């Protein structure tokens, strides 16, 4: 939703308003005289569905007469106004001068600023899309409408050969840039991006030469300026990138990476930070471009939610002990057992990278001592199984399970009563309980478990790729296969109910696929083989096979070879791949994350107009926030923020938000929940069969305001005694239909 800054300057004049139904500003006209600014005029542009800009000429605000007239032009395809600076005469109530700043350049001061009072119009991270104010024979005051600013793309500089690559503008920032350099050019660039707190790596070119890097103090530091040179490399006769240098939001300047050449280029966008690269590369970096996005320094991260404490289970008696929950991982477990039961336990932890040795709980005695070690870099404790003697009040046996392995039963479980410590989707970071001469009972502290990364298996050649851990699950895996190897892998991921496809390798050979019944089925096991391919003399992935949470086993894709590998993480599902590929799949690795099958929910059919593509957010525990965006014809987009196991789960945009942005309806979750949705729809010319024009949400406590305009065709979504726990529907650049998932209250 657009933000309106009230008019600033002198008092008086007649009110005028260009409104905010534009997408950008194309040209500014300012006429000045001895008294001050005589008039302003703004020409706008509005983009149609094909992204073709339609000009909209503005009106004159003030009075045109003898004076100097200056213009300031803006390229609406890649440029936008970020701020206005002005001066006014308070006694006369007239603006004396104006200066306009875009993401790429700044105008001259138009008028004069001698002894005037200064004002400014600026909202961090937003662009001006319209103006308003007061004027008579002169301009008295000026205000503006702001909308979220789009990223700025700088075209690549350098040669036009080699392979085109583009990382896009969907990252939050850059954490590190690394290089391979020789005496004449940049052979390789490696970028570590931040995406919602996780690192995603990309690399382009050949890893040949000396290694250098520039590390950012992200998220408090960003790259705000990039300078480079390019020229012909004599031994190849190709125009390539020869040097790069960066400046940051903290005033730091990087070293010059490479050798400075004749042709200089600069990428800089006022008030913006570098969030992505694109270019061309093969044996070296032939060309490079960049994306910049308005810079808003991150607020301090909210504190993590408190650990969940499971009360001690086992026998009665003993003295209370507590290792507390202020650790990051459990690294080693010591258990001493005897004839009566477990004599003592001891846990070693790590906190902020530093080892912490725990205390003995129980009494050291004669007995067998066993240890169980956990690698904190990629392994975590997910559960404990135990047995106790109720009459003696003593724990008799313990078994520990991580995301990768399970210990033996330490002690004995004959005729004992069983207990377990486990919270789905979480890991153990601390223990507590009761003990005296023996261990009487045991409890644990749980926090959300991180994804598990399995390093890629196969060869070390070809192009590195990494899909990361930001997907919800895998819907389908497809392959191109020949007689010896896997030539290509294609993955259909689920992300907020939408499908995102990634593919790596060459699409050569026969086609095979494995479809998962997501979201009720996940891949929980992956097995493969790799070996040297004789005709290429390269170690590559030769076969892959999968098992699912429903007990299904896929066919073997490819030809089984000698070197076997297995990826499996207890209680976890496959959510992402990484590896290396070019003409074939050279190597593959995987990410697994703890999963909880969604509860059984009832689907209520989507209502509204016809048209659009289907989408589904899936089923959650509840709804936290609702965002509704409006356009010319009706509801342009919706977005929902859910609760999933006490964690915030943000859905995707369904439809296309306009520069008006979103209106928000925030629920007092978990005490408040949605019971019904009311809506209207209508057939609108150009909307392809009908669009939803209004939505209104009713909770167990209140009713939201209507978002949009009511029409004669309406609908209600809901079921008595049920609450809404997810949404689905159809959309294009607008919202056509909306349906819901409901569960009993």
Swiss-Prot record:
Cystine crosslinks: none
InterPro entries hit by this protein: Jacalin-like_lectin_dom, Jacalin-like_lectin_dom_plant, Jacalin-like_lectin_dom_sf
CDD domains, per database record: Jacalin (cd09612)
Key words of the record: Lectin, Repeat
Domain called Jacalin-type lectin: residue spans: 2-148, 151-294, 307-448, 451-594, 601-744
GO terms assigned for molecular function: carbohydrate binding
Family: Belongs to the jacalin lectin family.
The protein, known as: Jacalin-related lectin 4
Organism the protein comes from: Arabidopsis thaliana
Lineage: Eukaryota, Viridiplantae, Streptophyta, Embryophyta, Tracheophyta
